[in-house]
Amino acid sequence: MARPTVIAPSEATATPRSRRSVASGQLALELPLGLPELAIAPEWKAQQRLWGHSLHPMCSYLASFPAALAHAFIARYSRPGDVVLDPFSGRGTTPLQACAEGRIGVGNDLNPFAYLLTASKVDPASPAESRTRLAALRLAWNVDSAGWLALAERVIARPGHPASWIPEAGSGRGPHDHDESVPDEVALAFHPRTLAQLLFVRSALRLDDPTDRFLAAGLTGILHGKSASYLSELMPNTFSMAPRYVREFAARTEFHSPSRDVFDCLGLKLDRLYRQPLPPSRGLALLGDARDAADRARCALREAGRPDRARLVVTSPPYLRVVKYGYYNWLRTWLLGFDARAIDATLDDAHHREPYLAFLRDVLADLRSVLTDDAVVVLVIGDVETDRGRTIRGGVGLAERVWETAAAPEGYALAGVALDDVAAGRKMTKLWGDEAGRATKTDRILVLGATESGRRRALAGAGLDIDWTWPPRALRAI
């Protein structure tokens, strides 16, 4: 096994900033002064965009790393049967990839939309369950389609009027029950028949049922986009454009969405999601604050009869001020019955540096009780330079500050930093025009050991050769 290279600053080698070239044609990346380099080549960047399990692209989600990056660390630092934890699971990339590789993936998030995506991936409905439920929904729609079509016409013609109110999401109620109003921009986005079907499905799907939850998650992934596989062409698939933009664009262009059948489009989405067999291992999804995830994870693991300590953490803490997960998913959250403003208020992601560092210290302190003695903790931390054109003070060199003020005081052992430049042309935010790629230009991957034993394991695993075939050869017998 090739021994890893650890470059530590010294009087002979230290410069204002250590530098190295990652690959031919790429800019040299900078290491924060004082942090050693962990020589893990970013091979994940050479993989196909949709590398990994077919459940990964269930729905786009901003500020998420690719499945290949998760694999690079899961393959190095865990074995089949180990628990792999992500306390900021987002769309569930780490726990799903862990389950796909025979580990026990555990994801936690405070965002109910992220929780739904994670739960749908680590505890998915079977193809038979999903398709049977979809067929039943189609039959139920056919029975009462006239009532839902009339409701959709009222929603479009008389927005906000009590006569155009709709049933609550997940209530199972019919088109003549009026619980809540519909945002004007929702009516602008869809063809009347498509809107009618969405209103029906929104009422029918119960998110506490695993099969309905899986269908709802798949539906969020086809809600809007620029091809015939999406229910509306008003917006890109990556995120929901601002409501004001939607109103102005629809008025300026006289936008009319083509008619798309919800059941047909969702059926095709299921075909894509089930292109590969379901993961060999089931995982766990938790809804709650990352600062108290450890006890909840251990309790859930024990109840499931699984090991109650994680051997690996792979996570990306929320970026400073950059992403409002409710706001950028307002149409998806409406479909699910969630309040986008309440999500953003709960997440409170607009941290300045010092409160952000204190928050991460609380998270790392809490995690200690769920980690094995030789656990490895991988933190993907982006340098945040701008937020909608405004320079963010203290956003560059964040990994060093996380180590100094959040990880080191809690007894973690530093293995080093791996670097990953963020190519603007490949980011979801490339649609933001001049702002594209400027918010986060470099991800610094901070690799820690829970103890000195974990640090030594992190160093030893850095030089391992990783199998990038999918599924990996070692897993084909699982």
What is each model feature region?
Residues 2-80:
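S-adenosyl-L-methionine
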Residues 70, 82-101, 105-112, 118, ...:
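Conserved proline-anchored active-site loop of SAM-dependent methyltransferases
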Residues 113-204, 338-347:
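Conserved phosphoryl-transfer catalytic core
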Residues 123, 320, 382-386:
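Short "lid" loop at the C-terminus of a central beta-strand within the Rossmann-like core
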Residues 212, 346-417:
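Conserved Class I SAM-dependent methyltransferase catalytic core
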Residues 295-313, 318-376:
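SAM-dependent methyltransferase catalytic-core segment centered on the flexible catalytic loop
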